[in-house]
Amino acid sequence: MKKILSLIALAVISVSAFAQKLDKAEARQLKAFFTQSAEKDGTNANALKVSDVNNLAAVEGLTIENGHVTAIEWKDKHLAGSLDLSGFKALKKVDVSRNRISSIDVSDNPALADFNASRNVLTAVNFANCPALTKISVYKNRLTDVSLETVPLLENLNVSNNLFVELNVSNSTTLKTLNCQGCHLENLMVSGCTNLQNLYCGYNKLTSLNLFGVENLQNLNVDDNEITTMIVSGLPALSTFVCSDNRMTTLGVRNCDRLIDLVCSYNDLTTLSVEGCPNLTFVDCSYNDLTQLDLSNLTFLQRLLCNNNQLNTLDVSFDSALVYVNCRYNFITDFRTIGCTNLRMVACQWNF
């Protein structure tokens, strides 16, 4: 029995000693956050069910190693206020999404790699001197600005549904995915992002987009902007391009060898130029003002939606993989389907 009691006492002493080793500055900053009011009644400490703020090792979602916080996972805990995590030297991961936090400072965190504060009410976030940060998710907040100048390894950035007017990530050579949809962007700068593969910038107020030096782009979505003229050329890796709802009058897609899906519906296009895109399998150019459309010799094209235009002529000759065509609500008198050996369905009602 004495041996058992001794072991228990030793364990308690070890835990107490471990808790006491936590960096004093980190402990002070966490305690300051705990005393702030939570989204609902009580404090953030109450929301996290913290009974003893001096025993931080026991706080749920807080990982401490060698006297330093290495991870914070407080998703959907009804937290609120300002969270200062600056100078947490060993902090690698932060997930405080789905709360009501208004500002976060994670500056000077050399080990931080993954940061998620989406679905809060953030008006400010500080990423200064976070050299290891590769993933940032701050979508659905109230941010008007974000500085990424000292985040050299960033690969994935989601800032969608914020209040940006301008966003500049030019020459971010490690960036692979950028989602900035649903903001108020009038100016987006991505030139020189040589490794960018996925760009989602729909539902903004963009009037133009410069893709110079973005040659590895695979997926591009510029839905619901104000771009009237767009030429997409020389993007050899591009596989999906969506540009619907843009008031677009001119669209040219050229020399995109791997392009598979093209969606440019609900614009004001009178002509559509698709050159050097031999691997197209799906085209949706419905609800435009096209008077003629030549998509012949696209041997991989399987589905074509060109309904609700002003087409007089439609040429899909020698599209040997073509299975379905919807060309309803046009004025087609010349429809060319020579060599379309797999064509199974043509929806062509209301052409007159």
Language-model segments: which ranges?
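Conserved hydrophobic beta-strand positions in leucine-rich repeat
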Residues: 70-72, 94-96, 113-117, 136-138, ...
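Leucine-rich solenoid repeat scaffolds
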Residues: 333-352
